[in-house]
A protein has these predicted regions:
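Exposed beta-strand-loop-beta-strand "reactive/processing" segments of non-cytosolic proteins
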Residues: 37-42, 147-150, 155
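Generic short beta-strand segments
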Residues: 26-31, 150-159, 207
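Short, hydrophobic/aromatic-rich segments at coil-to-beta transitions
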Residues: 19-26, 47-50, 142-150, 200-203
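Short hydrophobic/aromatic-rich beta-strand segments that constitute the beta-sheet cores
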Residues: 49-53, 68-73, 201-206
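N-terminal leader/targeting segments and the immediate start of mature chains
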Residues: 1-47, 74-108, 126-140, 176-180, ...
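Short, surface-exposed beta-strand-loop junctions and turns on beta-sheet-rich folds
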Residues: 57-60, 67, 155-156, 209-211
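Short, surface-exposed charged micro-motifs
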Residues: 39-41, 50, 60, 189-193
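Non-transmembrane domains of secretory- and envelope-associated proteins
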Residues: 129-132, 141-144, 155, 169-190, ...
Length: 248
């Protein structure tokens, strides 16, 4: 079987919005004192999210009031293998998942910033790779097929939000923060994994730098399982929150 290429990796990074509808997963971070809790989440596209600690403490239920995508919204240009060659750009189309705490959450679920660069996140050019991608290797991640690559950001890298990019980059930090909030030493590269079935970024890991090993590790537990409305209901004030679930 032919190993995936850097172009395959980029195409998978573009594809998440069109590869799944519901997701249950856990995620934990390394090397970040602000994100030191392991979480479990249930996400139902386009606008429902439930987040708990892995011990069952309910942290937040998000119920956005998002209008369904207009039937006239353009569809992506696909490759013969079904991965996305070019994402549509239209005000009629919104593919962002509900956010928990920061846009890092949105970016790991839809890691388009790892595919194409440009002048802004919404104006991307497939001819401007966001990353320099070393050999792509098929691996197992949490019992699921994934593609792993060691990558480096290019001058075209444009994260969804500069304050919480998937990959820390000196240029992006300077644009976002000026002389503040800089790393003492930036990573030489990053290890990144994309889940093949969903396109979700399931791993980032800094290689070298002042905080080696920093990143996130997401483990997918279920894809496209039914998720009832009752799962996305906050308990009434005063109810015991730990482990509370209307579907138990």
């Amino acid at each position: 079987m032919t190993s995936p290429s850097a172009e395959d990796f980029r195409a998978l990074a573009r594809s998440s919005p069109w590869r799944w509808s519901t997701l249950r997963f856990t995620v934990q971070w390394s090397g970040d004192s602000h994100r030191d809790r392991s979480l479990r989440a249930w996400l139902r596209r386009p606008d429902r999210l439930r987040v708990e600690t892995v011990d069952g403490e309910l942290l937040q239920v998000i119920r956005e009031r998002r209008q369904p995508s207009d039937v006239a919204a353009p569809t992506p240009e696909r490759r013969p293998d079904g991965l996305v060659a070019r994402r549509p750009v239209s005000r009629l189309l919104s593919v962002d998942d509900p956010m928990y705490q920061s846009y890092f959450w949105v970016a790991m679920l839809d890691p388009a910033e790892l595919a194409d660069g440009g002048s802004s996140f919404d104006e991307r050019d497939v001819d401007l790779p966001a990353l320099s991608v070393d050999e792509v290797v098929p691996v197992d991640h949490g019992g699921r097929p994934a593609w792993e690559a060691v990558v480096r950001t290019t001058p075209h890298y444009e994260p969804r939000c500069g304050c919480c990019s998937l990959l820390r980059d000196r240029r992006i930090d300077e644009l976002e923060w000026g002389g503040e909030n800089q790393l003492a030493e930036y990573p030489d590269a990053y290890r990144v994994r994309l889940d093949v079935g969903t396109g979700v970024c399931v791993l980032t890991e800094a290689i070298g730098g002042s905080n080696p090993g920093a990143g996130h590790d997401l483990r997918i537990e279920a894809v496209d399982d039914p998720m009832a409305d009752e799962l996305f209901v906050e308990p009434r004030r005063g109810l015991f929150r730990r482990g509370w679930s209307p579907v138990q």
